[in-house]
Amino acid sequence: MQIMLCAISNIASGNCSEDCKYCTQSAHVKTDIQKYRRKELSQIVLEAKMAKKNEALGFCLVTAGLGLDDEKLEYVCEAAKAVQKEVPNLLLIACNGMASVEQLKELKKAGIFSYNHNLETSKEFFPQICTTHTWESRFQTNLNAKEAGLMLCCGGIYGMGESEEDRLSFRKSLQELQPFSTPINFFIANENLKLQVPRLSADEALKIVRDTKEALPQSVVMVAGGREVVLQERQYEIFQAGAGAIVIGDYLTTKGEEPSQDIIKLKEMGFTFASECH
């Protein structure tokens, strides 16, 4: 079985104005994460080279904050061009919050293949986890990305206290968007976060993967944050459940498994890794 690997570069971290209860990058909570306004381009390129060495096809440039402004847009475009020049065979993904059609067209010109902007959860449950912006504004950014000609990467977070009805509603909204890829994150509580809920079981997490693939058969289901913690020794069962991709290495503010360990285990299990996008 061939699967797709993606890596993340957190190129602007922390001090986000938004109050998303699940996020350690919010300025509304005190956490000990690294905070920086921008990462050096040379460091981003180095991380891209490491990602490629570890069999990644996708490389995501992530910035904290509500959305793109002129300065941030210019910086992300610079980063994309720098990576493209040195590692031309990576698929570049941008994850920079709210964005207009015009801004997203600029990202596409700079070499961005796909835009990631998660709905996070259902329209009904969203006000319980964020009050500083609306679910509708997130949905609109996804429509903007499609209009700009970008591929769409849109998913969310499970295990925040949402109901099964919320999960169904959330997946129906994703069906409207028909994203190229749909990331699944499993919420991991942090003592500094306002959101304190029981962790998902491995069985429940695998059911979420199956239900997502059933709802979105044409989308690449990508399991991202929380994979190692929630699923532990069962984490590679996600592929039998319908996943076609994982995020390798460090996540935004938490440690993932060392990429090489994932590669070793997956190769032992007979998996091969996508080197181009079909």
From Swiss-Prot:
Task: Give UniProt keywords alphabetically.
Answer: 2Fe-2S, 4Fe-4S, Biotin biosynthesis, Iron, Iron-sulfur, Metal-binding, S-adenosyl-L-methionine, Transferase
Q: Which residues bind [4Fe-4S] cluster?
A: 16, 20, 23
What reaction is this protein's catalytic activity? Answer: (4R,5S)-dethiobiotin + (sulfur carrier)-SH + 2 reduced [2Fe-2S]-[ferredoxin] + 2 S-adenosyl-L-methionine = (sulfur carrier)-H + biotin + 2 5'-deoxyadenosine + 2 L-methionine + 2 oxidized [2Fe-2S]-[ferredoxin]
PROSITE patterns (alphabetical): RADICAL_SAM (PS51918)
A Pfam family of the record is BATS
Q: What cofactor is this protein dependent on? A: [4Fe-4S] cluster; [2Fe-2S] cluster
One of the protein's GO biological processes? biotin biosynthetic process
Which pathway, per its entry?
Cofactor biosynthesis; biotin biosynthesis; biotin from 7,8-diaminononanoate: step 2/2
Give me the comment on cofactor binding: Binds 1 [4Fe-4S] cluster. The cluster is coordinated with 3 cysteines and an exchangeable S-adenosyl-L-methionine. Binds 1 [2Fe-2S] cluster. The cluster is coordinated with 3 cysteines and 1 arginine.
List of residues binding [2Fe-2S] cluster: 60, 95, 153
Entry EC number(s): 2.8.1.6
Give the InterPro entries listed for this entry. Answer: Aldolase_TIM, BATS_dom, Biotin_synth/BioAB, Biotin_synthase, Elp3/MiaA/NifB-like_rSAM, rSAM
Q: Which residues form the Radical SAM core domain?
A: 1-227
SMART domains, from UniProt? Answer: BATS, Elp3
Instruction: Tell me which PANTHER family the record gives.
Output: BIOTIN SYNTHASE, BIOTIN SYNTHASE, MITOCHONDRIAL
The record's note on quaternary structure and interaction partners says: Homodimer.
Instruction: Write out the function statement from the record.
Output: Catalyzes the conversion of dethiobiotin (DTB) to biotin by the insertion of a sulfur atom into dethiobiotin via a radical-based mechanism.
User: Per the similarity annotation, which family is this?
Assistant: Belongs to the radical SAM superfamily. Biotin synthase family.
Q: What is this protein called?
A: Biotin synthase
Taxonomic placement:
Bacteria, Pseudomonadati, Campylobacterota, Epsilonproteobacteria, Campylobacterales
